[in-house]
Amino acid sequence: MLFLGAGELGKEVAIELMRLGAWVCAADSYAGAPAQQVAHEYRALDMANAAELQALFDEIKPDIIVPEVEAIATDVLAGTAAAGAQVVPSAEIAAICMDRERLRVLAHEELGLPTTPYRFAGSLEELRAGASEVGYPCVVKPVMSSSGHGQSVVRSADAIDAAWTEAQEGRRAADEGDVSRVIVEALAPLERELTVLTVSSSAGIVTCAPIGQRQESGDYRESWQPATEPDGEAERARDIARTAVEGLVAKAQAAGETGWGVFGVELFVLTDGSILFNEVSPRPHDTGMVTMASQRLSEFALHARAILGLPITPEHVSLTIPAGSVAASHAIVVAGDGEVEFTDVAAALAEPGTDLRIFAKPEVHGHRRMAVALAVGESEADARAKAGLVADALTITVE
């Protein structure tokens, strides 16, 4: 089992796989990444470099490859899948989900899922025309980027040139010189966002209870499950997620791959109550860390079992918290430059119904997610407050 990316989510998946007897090698761009600390072996390399990635595959000869990040040479991944390695969930799905154009065409134009109005553009002139068609305000993104890089909100035609420049500078492989296509989409009247974890396994596709979330600057800060929703919203959200994953898995199986694993389906809930498809992460989702406190099996255990061909049923994704209660997670983001030390852990965990995961990342330069607090409460507000108390009680030193 070879992990491409060895962050905190990969660490939890690696642990679950090792509990089931798997041998794990964890690769990342640096040594000492969280999953490398628990794996049998590790490697450090530039996974977006085709030659380095091919050399890694030639050395390890993995049976199963688990991509945990997006910055991967997908052509090499596809070649290895064609040669017989199992890519999770598939090389084809990884390529589609990295490309907003391919994913949006599949979701809206092939599967008929509701989305914001959008256009694609390969030049500044096409972007101007597309923005005029979808209307202002609108959002401009590179078709290939992650974590909000290259994204901007455009409120008038005067800002289009700057948005084009931002997209080109923030796209994946921006130093390679090619011009990136962009997507421009209408800025929806957003009320909130949901994640629906959806599992494809040898037993078919099942969905988890929707997860609510709060973001800052495009990054996850809190999540809670089950999300508080009006009647019928949860099933509508789960139906959209199931349809999206069914479409992706069909592509994988047509290419001779399994399509097994956990998918994080991201949805928009608008002020009028309608639900729109946004994107899919073909791996465990950061908002899904809350499942370590809420479900029969966490998203990491679900991913591990699905990867190994074990069946996942509705019982495995059921909530195990008391009826009417809510679980919450709170990301602990550290700012500074140097090594990080956590103290006052006992005080942080003094609140009943709470837990903590410290990721043991070696250092921070700027801002970095270093831990997550977990809590179960009688309501969404109670659970979120308890998780926040855990985070606030920690003393964090950067040296």
Curated annotation (Swiss-Prot):
Encoding gene (name): purT
Q: Which family is this protein grouped under? A: Belongs to the PurK/PurT family.
ATP-grasp domain location: 105-308
Protein name as annotated = Formate-dependent phosphoribosylglycinamide formyltransferase
The record's GO molecular-function terms, alphabetically, read: ATP binding; magnesium ion binding; phosphoribosylglycinamide formyltransferase 2 activity; phosphoribosylglycinamide formyltransferase activity
- The residues that the entry says bind N(1)-(5-phospho-beta-D-ribosyl)glycinamide are 8-9, 68, 286, 361, 368-369
The UniProt entry, under PANTHER family, shows: FORMATE-DEPENDENT PHOSPHORIBOSYLGLYCINAMIDE FORMYLTRANSFERASE
Binding residues annotated for Mg(2+), in chain numbering: 266, 279
Q: How does it assemble?
A: Homodimer.
Q: What does this protein do?
A: Involved in the de novo purine biosynthesis. Catalyzes the transfer of formate to 5-phospho-ribosyl-glycinamide (GAR), producing 5-phospho-ribosyl-N-formylglycinamide (FGAR). Formate is provided by PurU via hydrolysis of 10-formyl-tetrahydrofolate.
Q: Which organism is it from?
A: Bifidobacterium longum (strain NCC 2705)
